[in-house]
Amino acid sequence: MRLDKFLCDALGTTRKEATQLLKSGEVTVDDVVQKSGAFKLKETSCVEWQGREITLHGPRYIMMHKPDGVVCSHEDGFNQTALTLLDEVNIQDLHFAGRLDVDTTGLLLITDDGQWSHRVTSPKHKCEKTYRVWLADPIQADYAEQFNRGIELRGERELTLPAQLEVISETEVLLTIHEGKYHQVKRMFAALGNKVIGLHRERIGQITLDETLEPGEYRYLTEEEVASIWK
């Protein structure tokens, strides 16, 4: 394949834009700057743009440390969207595998693989999600038992699925749920007469938020992390 055709397909650029990228000297093939669009790539060629390898094949799986005040949508008239924090091409093709409220922080999964994200979010698969929760009032002695039995949410007839509560302090807990109802964690504690004042997602399935990521930073998932969702 010609190098300029590869850039058009991989980056979604026009042929003219690909030519301009090549002229900039920011494109390398196997660590050698290439400025000719006619350069023929081999199957083993490693193409980099601005020091980052670009490929044609394979969906994208991204872990982000979502900061406070950022919304999980493609467009928003008031708040910054999480997708604008990505330095990636064709971000319009990406979507969230489990959204977070604007005031909730932590692990956010982003992908363009619809089947994979469905596996994360579908109630049928009961994918575990662990949250660190800060409460306005001290927890009561029977909280863990009530969560394990299921909580009756306001406006719903069925109890939530059993959830696991780990007490960190009198106003801080880790809560693991197996479904994803609207504002579920906040509503569960509200049903017990308490109020969530801070919420941070730490884990989805076997994928745990990378401790090295600062709020707003992201990285691609490892092959093992991607595969874990199918287990």
UniProtKB/Swiss-Prot annotation:
Keywords: Isomerase, RNA-binding, rRNA processing. The active site is at 101 (nucleophile). The keyword Isomerase applies. It is an enzyme of class 5 (isomerase). Its EC number is 5.4.99.19. One of its GO terms (cellular component) is cytosol. InterPro entries: PsdUridine_s_RsuA/RluB/E/F_cat (IPR042092), PsdUridine_synth_cat_dom_sf (IPR020103), PsdUridine_synth_RsuA/RluA (IPR006145), PsdUridine_synth_RsuA/RluB/E/F (IPR000748), PsdUridine_synth_RsuA/RluB_CS (IPR018496), RsuA_PseudoU_synthase (IPR050343), S4_RNA-bd (IPR002942), S4_RNA-bd_sf (IPR036986). The keyword Metal-binding does not apply. One of its GO terms (molecular function) is 16S rRNA pseudouridine(516) synthase activity. One of its GO terms (biological process) is enzyme-directed rRNA pseudouridine synthesis. It catalyses: uridine(516) in 16S rRNA = pseudouridine(516) in 16S rRNA. Residues 1-67 form the S4 RNA-binding domain. It comes from the Bacteria. Gene3D superfamilies: Alpha-L RNA-binding motif, Pseudouridine synthase I, catalytic domain, N-terminal subdomain, RNA-binding S4 domain. PROSITE patterns: PSI_RSU, S4. Responsible for synthesis of pseudouridine from uracil-516 in 16S ribosomal RNA. Belongs to the pseudouridine synthase RsuA family. This is Ribosomal small subunit pseudouridine synthase A. It comes from Vibrio cholerae serotype O1 (strain ATCC 39315 / El Tor Inaba N16961). The lineage of its organism: Bacteria, Pseudomonadati, Pseudomonadota, Gammaproteobacteria, Vibrionales. The gene is rsuA.
